[in-house]
UniProtKB/Swiss-Prot annotation:
The gene is rI. It comes from Enterobacteria phage T4. The keyword Oxidoreductase does not apply. One of its GO terms (biological process) is killing of cells of another organism. Changing residue 69 to S: Complete loss of lysis. GO terms for molecular function: DNA binding; molecular function inhibitor activity. HAMAP family: ANTIH_T4. Its main location: host cell. Disulfide bonds join 69-75. Residues 1-24 form the signal peptide. It holds the Pfam family Antiholin. Changing residue 24 to P: Complete loss of processing of signal sequence. This is Antiholin. Homotetramer; in free-form. Homomultimer. Heterotetramer composed of 2 holin and 2 antiholin. The holin-antiholin complex binds dsDNA. Interacts (via C-terminus) with holin (via C-terminus); this interaction blocks the holin homomultimerization and delays the host cell lysis. Involved in lysis inhibition. Senses superinfections and inhibits the holin, thereby delaying the host cell lysis timing. The genomic DNA from the superinfecting phage bound to the complex holin-antiholin probably serves as a signal for the lysis inhibition and blocks the holin multimerization.
Amino acid sequence: MALKATALFAMLGLSFVLSPSIEANVDPHFDKFMESGIRHVYMLFENKSVESSEQFYSFMRTTYKNDPCSSDFECIERGAEMAQSYARIMNIKLETE
């Protein structure tokens, strides 16, 4: 009986060791792109809501996916530009206006 339990634990341990590790798909350039858009434009939206946040995120994600940036500097610049474009396209009033 002890031999069965030992074999079972050994098999379980081996399956954990041999199973592929799960990695999060993290793109640091996308993070810079989004942070820049949020900091420079989204925070100035007069009316913020869950719906407006989701729409903004969807626009930014799609824009980035279609034409990703390749350096932190480029991502910061383009993130702010795309967020400004979104505000213009959607006729969103900013606090500075």
